[in-house]
Regions:
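N-terminal Rossmann-like NAD(P) cofactor-binding subdomain of oxidoreductases
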Residues: 2-168
């Protein structure tokens, strides 16, 4: 991770429903997180369209366009590199100086596949689905977030079902 004064550099692997929702939340938040890159195999124009026109969240107010393999959102400099790489071990996380990869494809959910992001240069991986085998931690906010520490590299935020039931 970077010094406390710099932003945390994050990449999203998988720009489906979860990946797009994460980006929308971060766009609307005042946070020290910088979305640096998105890796998805879809057509870039289609990805931009799906971000702009969401059936659940509605139309994103900011302008969304593709320029030179970058997703440009708004006029304030959201300039996100787009990558289309099927193999996580070949994604240039080290070159991009990525602190955290948000793994949102659903395809990589075991320790071995998640470690490919670490081997490619990412500092940590947050899995958006339940893991298929043992990783460093599965965290449910409001239940066990106190076990999370900075040494953990592979964590999961459980599942949408688990998180919706946690407050009960």
């Amino acid at each position: 991770m970077k010094e406390s004064m710099s932003k945390t550099r994050v990449a999203i692997n998988g720009f489906g429903r979860i990946g797009r929702t994460i980006l929308r939340i971060l766009l609307l938040s005042d946070t020290d997180i910088e979305i640096v890159a998105i890796n998805d195999l879809g057509d870039y124009q289609t990805l931009a369209y799906l971000l702009k026109y969401d059936t659940v969240f509605g139309v994103l107010k900011e302008d969304v366009r593709i320029e030179n393999k970058k997703l440009i959102v708004g006029n304030n400099g959201y300039n996100i590199k787009l990558i289309s790489e099927r193999d996580p071990s070949l994604i240039p996380w080290k070159e991009l100086d990525i602190d955290i990869v948000i793994e949102a494809t659903g395809a990589f959910a075991n320790r071995e596949s998640l470690e490919q992001h670490i081997n490619a240069g990412a500092g940590k991986v947050i899995l958006t689905v339940p893991p298929k085998d043992e990783i460093d931690a599965t965290i449910v906010l409001g239940v066990n977030e106190e076990v999370l520490d900075g040494s953990m590299q592979l964590i999961s935020n459980a599942s949408c079902t688990t998180n919706c039931l946690a407050p009960i």
